[in-house]
Amino acid sequence: MGEQPIFSTRAHVFQIDPNTKKNWVPTSKHAVTVSYFYDSTRNVYRIISLDGSKAIINSTITPNMTFTKTSQKFGQWADSRANTVYGLGFSSEHHLSKFAEKFQEFKEAARLAKEKSQEKMELTSTPSQESAGGDLQSPLTPESINGTDDERTPDVTQNSEPRAEPTQNALPFSHSSAISKHWEAELATLKGNNAKLTAALLESTANVKQWKQQLAAYQEEAERLHKRVTELECVSSQANAVHTHKTELNQTIQELEETLKLKEEEIERLKQEIDNARELQEQRDSLTQKLQEVEIRNKDLEGQLSDLEQRLEKSQNEQEAFRNNLKTLLEILDGKIFELTELRDNLAKLLECS
């Protein structure tokens, strides 16, 4: 069974161009497993990465090596034995920091192992090999190297709640007219707000384009500075000057990255404003549709009211004719009653005379 790695992660692997000593050349088409191993037979620590069956990194860690973070997700180190500079691009700053911590830890372990080895050689005693906890003394295999990183990014889901629509109840004509006026006023207000939001949206779009141009310029400048740092680090004859320039350039890169972060936050804010403007536009369209429905309802109520008025007028005319007929009948009845009264009086007089 192959020797197990002490620590593994995944990253994109690069090497410095051996001709120009400036540009990075990718040695893997995608992220591969990069692992730390302890070679107990030679008492050294190694960084090994395989792309299939091909070893794209086989670097022995020495006490004088330094792992440098050149950005939030990129780090590099120079291997004088392999006469090259390795670069690793990680998926997050956390993975880069973890790899750098392990590099420093195993670098210190390599220094201590070297000192112990020298002391034992001076004492001409048989060296005892001590392996790191959990390591197996067996040859390295691709199967043992290509592990998986134990860092996982949780998925985030977004839940949206549907908005309840108000119920449409039948309204009397007077109430319906009041609601219609209310919706018209609301629509006028929304039109004014929509005009303001449209202007703000156009301004935000122009600002986004400007930020993107500045962002591209900053990224290009940061890439140029990264290449410059790599070039300076590879020139061993100018170590002091390289260190000074490297510090200045790293500071400049950090400032540029902070500026980029601020610009990205500004872009996110502008995107949020655009989303809000779109939401208000959707609300305006919904209110416009509701207003149209209310207007249609008003027309229906007006038709019903006109029909009721005609029916009422017809009923009133019929009642007036009935009253006139009744009045005529009453007058005739009064005449008949008067005649009957006279007849009764005359009959009474005849009875008295007889």
UniProtKB/Swiss-Prot annotation:
Residues with the N-acetylglycine modification: 2
Sequence segments annotated as region (Required for tetramerization): 290-354
Gene3D superfamilies reported for this sequence: 1.20.5.1700, Pleckstrin-homology domain (PH domain)/Phosphotyrosine-binding domain (PTB)
Modified residues (Phosphoserine): 306
Coiled coil (UniProt feature): 181-352
UniProt key word Phosphoprotein: yes
Region called Disordered, residue ranges: 114-173
Free-text note on domains in this protein's UniProt record: The WH1 domain interacts with the PPXXF motif in GRM1, GRM5, RYR1, RYR2, ITPR1, SHANK 1 and SHANK3. The coiled-Coil domain forms an antiparallel tetrameric arrangement.
Subunit description: Tetramer; this tetrameric structure is critical for forming the high-order complex with SHANK1, which in turn is necessary for the structural and functional integrity of dendritic spines. Interacts with GRM1, GRM5, ITPR1, DNM3, RYR1, RYR2 and SHANK3. Interacts with IFT57 and OPHN1. Isoform 1 encodes a coiled-coil structure that mediates homo- and heteromultimerization. Interacts with SHANK1; forms high-order polymerized complex with a mesh-like network structure, at least composed of SHANK1, HOMER1 and DLGAP1; the complex formation is SHANK1 multimerization dependent. Interacts with NFATC4.
Name used for this protein in its record: Homer protein homolog 1
Organism: Homo sapiens
